[in-house]
Amino acid sequence: MDGNDLVENKCPVMHGGITVAGHSNTAWWPETLNLEILHQHDTKVSPLGKDFNYRDAVKSLDFEALKKDMHDLMTNSQDWWPADYGHYGGLMIRLAWHSAGSYRLADGRGGGNTGNIRFAPLNSWPDNGNLDKARRLLWPIKKKYGNKISWADLILLSGTIAYESMGLKTYGFSFGREDIWAPEKDVYWGAEKEWLAPSDERYTDVDKPETMENPLAAVQMGLIYVNPEGVNGKSDPLKSAAQVRETFARMAMNDEETAALTCGGHTVGKAHGNGDAGKLSPPPEGNDLETQGFGWMNPNMDGKATNAVTSGIEGAWTTHPTKWDMGYFHLLFGYEWELTKSPAGASQWRPINIKEEDMPVDPTDPTKRVMPMMTDADMAMKMDPAYNAICQKFMADQAYFSDTFARAWFKLTHRDLGPRVRYIGPDAPQEDLIWQDPVPAGSKSYDVAAVKAKIADSGLSLSEMVSTAWDSARTFRGSDLRGGANGARIRLAPQKDWAGNEPARLQKVLSVLEPIASATGASVADVIVLAGNVGVEQAAKAAGFDISVPFSPGRGDATAEMTDADSFESLEPYADGFRNWQKEDYVVKPEELLLDRAQLLGLTGPEMTVLLGGMRVMGTNHGGTKHGVFTDKVGALTNDFFVNLTDMANKWVPRGKNAYDITDRKSGAVKFTATRADLVFGSNSILRAYAEIYAQDDAKEKFVKDFVAAWSKVMDADRFDLA
């Protein structure tokens, strides 16, 4: 029998269940904990293999040759997607902007650090219309330079080169972003089921922008920031100003940076709405096979940039859309504007009685002048008093505007690349910027053994040492590479006052550790971590194992002047399942909050499991509570948490919200108490499988070794200087 013998239309694959998405476990059981977020981006997904190191590969790139090729690309118009005014700069800026602009400060997720705009949902967001064309224009360059340049780097570089090619002196650029190879599973983009659903669905009160659901930073599903036509598509520049301010603040931009990015972003390029958006094909992810990843196909394009339809808004913002100049301010403030409609029916603003010489030329016919436009967000720059004042300052000093924009653009495109020690390439700026969370280099030459001896003799308890080290390190976020133990910012505002850090206990511990650091030449950051290591070693010894926790000296101590306190507020833990604590009751379940923290820390499922079990038996719960401390040998690094969790002689009885008793199944006597963050390791089938491994009789030593490895991973998560 061969394939020709198959009956037509009868599938040779049973049910298609392997290759076509069926009903997933989370669809059958929506309350199931989604542990997949801990195992995304596995090396098995990457075509480059587990031994490939992009950050090493990019260092061998011919940077100048690449930049020349990208400059040439800007004016090499292609028939299949003609360049506006013969220049792709505006398109490439939008690609870079929308790649980086999905970043949000609240959890550090989104952003351009992974090349995620290549995949769903971002590749098919309404606001990202026709950016598939921009990526295809970059393909010949990516093909030429291969694995020496990632898509993530190339996409963001394209915007910077575009600005350079149009006359802006940029602030710099760093390489070093590694591509992912599948869509992210950990990013919450919103609960809406429809693209561009009304803003009301993510606000408690849409008239109060600060009531937008956290961690979101865009006003509607499928937008990067705000609706350019106005709040819910209804023009009101002052309401738009309020939404612009909130959305940009949620990605760590102040008013001046926001105004600079808005005005500078619209100094070049144009919007596209010269046609019927209803005739466009589906976006890339939902389009036909033969379109080969292209979406928003326009049957009326006919090789003419003039007929393109993207946002539905039509026109350029300035007289010279391929030139970095002050034309945006000249038109916005030099004319009165009135509300009108684009050919696609979108709301936009047009100037009243504009002079012909101030009108931009047609994108494909330089002999023809056409009307410029402004969006509601642009009118907000004029009508909002604070933004207006900033614009007046820019208008009075072009050099100041250009420098402010260049720095804001650099921040936008590098916000999630991490500290300056990670920067790569000849154009990486050497200046320390406060939003990079700078940390001075620490000493590596002190006597580590002597420091550990002083800590051991200090009188601090095991719990105090381990808890303080954990609290210092747990702020790390793999999403934007912020936080962590390096810098010892736990001793500075705002961290020293966070409820999750137990300020009274923290100050007691610091009052002991800081003199040790001063006396030995070690940094406070190193001493805090060493204290945690001493505690872990003591706990292991109490369990019968002599181990040495790995340690690399060299952490530095940041100062208050190096710390943007407001920006660090977003790193405050409102829950920490590893220390069995929540600041208050939340709609989100404790186990989901635990999972989120584990993902941000870069932990796998087994690492999360072994860390929590070890933290429990060492008695490190917030406030000294006994929930989840399933042992009578507190302070010994035993596998008792898992042994008792999986012991069928025990019964689990709910005693109120997020409170459980562990009772003897026969007598009913209460043996332990627990929270959901404890019992999920026996309830969830995957976590129970991990727990059973660590509960086995032969797992005592493995448990200790695995705990130490996971502990060290967290302590060193921000040691980019060791890479």
From Swiss-Prot:
Binding-site positions, heme b: H266
PROSITE patterns listed in its UniProt record: PEROXIDASE_2, PEROXIDASE_4
Top-rank lineage group of the source organism: Bacteria
Pfam families named among the record's database cross-references: peroxidase
Any one GO BP annotation for this protein: hydrogen peroxide catabolic process
Site residues (Transition state stabilizer), renumbered to this chain: R94
GO molecular function (one): heme binding
Catalytic reaction(s) noted: H2O2 + AH2 = A + 2 H2O; 2 H2O2 = O2 + 2 H2O
Residues spanning the signal sequence: 1-29
Tagged with keyword Signal: yes
Quaternary organization: Homodimer or homotetramer.
Family: Belongs to the peroxidase family. Peroxidase/catalase subfamily.
Protein name: Catalase-peroxidase
